[in-house]
């Protein structure tokens, strides 16, 4: 939600940049870990990393990304790998869009 992000930026001032950098770095690492775990079907790792990105994304208002990560988390809990690569690809695309929006606010 762009309005929420603008509100956060106005509220946090200079600390908003640090928040964005931390979010981007954390999500990049978690998504990298999840991608590796998907390749070898380590469902507990997939679940953990998807949960982390979901929570961080909700906190900054990236609800679409949080929803996709929730779907991945559910698949991992059920050890359901049907279409998991396609879902992960959608997550990566959504994260790229979120990252671009955040960087545009800096």
Region locations from a protein language model:
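Two-component system phosphorelay core
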Residues: 1-106
């Amino acid at each position: 939600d762009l309005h929420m992000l603008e509100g956060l930026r106005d509220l946090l001032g200079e600390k908003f940049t640090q928040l964005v950098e931390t979010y981007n770095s954390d999500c990049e690492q978690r998504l990298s870990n999840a991608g590796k775990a998907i390749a070898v079907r380590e469902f507990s790792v997939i679940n953990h990393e998807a949960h982390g990105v979901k929570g961080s994304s909700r906190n900054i208002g990236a609800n679409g990304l949080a929803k996709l990560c929730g779907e991945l988390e559910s698949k991992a809990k059920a050890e359901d790998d049907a279409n998991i690569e396609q879902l992960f690809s959608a997550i990566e695309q959504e994260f790229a869009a979120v990252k671009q929006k955040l960087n545009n606010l800096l």
